[in-house]
Amino acid sequence: MKIVVITSSPHPHDESTSIYLADRFTKGATQAGHEVFTFDAANSDTHPCRGCDQCHMDGPCIWKDDIENTLMPKMLEADLLVLTTPLYYFGMSAQLKTIVDRFYSRTGKLHGKKSILMATAYNRDDWTMSALVDHYDTLVRYMEWQDAGKVLGIGCGSRSLVEHSKFGDMAEQMGAKL
């Protein structure tokens, strides 16, 4: 299976809680024989959708950045897309939202894929991820994707907290069982 993992934390790799989940997922998926490509949205040349409709929802996008030149070709070939984000004000990071908005340029061509959501948050209330999950579920429905699972790391406000939680194992097992 071809998998694209999109990370979106602006924190350094070794400090990020959501990238930790992405790394653990990748470890499991790679060991299971899957081909994994990781795109770091926070440290790439990306531009937001301008809504100009030059792509006519069928590409290409007017922006010739890392989304168009690197990520989009990989996404079009992928069977599974993994969206990873720290929770920022009860939603996805701005870095991931920039990527999601650019799905517009290939809406129809991205239909039919599987997807996974992985997110981390400091807060541990049971409602912490509700708005993010609602957004993701709506995206899955609109894009005609199949939700392949979620890892919602509540109470993971630091790298140490996520490393000592159950969520890393959950992410790795999710990758291994694909």
Regions found by a protein language model. Name each.
Residues 1-84, 90-101, 105, 168-178:
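N-terminal beta1-alpha1-beta2 submodule of the flavodoxin-like/Rossmannoid cofactor-binding fold
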Residues 6-7, 84, 117-121, 151-153:
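Short beta-strands and strand-loop turn motifs
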Residues 10-13, 88-89, 122-126, 156-159:
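Short histidine/acidic/glycine/proline-rich micro-motifs that form metal-
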Residues 14-17, 127-130, 160-165:
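Short, solvent-exposed loop/turn segments at secondary-structure boundaries
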Residues 67, 99, 117-118, 133, ...:
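Residue-level signal for alpha-helical context at structural boundaries
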Residues 69, 130, 134, 165-169:
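Generic alpha-helical secondary structure signal
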Residues 94, 107-150:
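Short, glycine-/small-residue-rich phosphate/pyrophosphate-handling segment
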Residues 136-154, 158, 162-165, 172, ...:
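A charged, well-structured terminal subsegment
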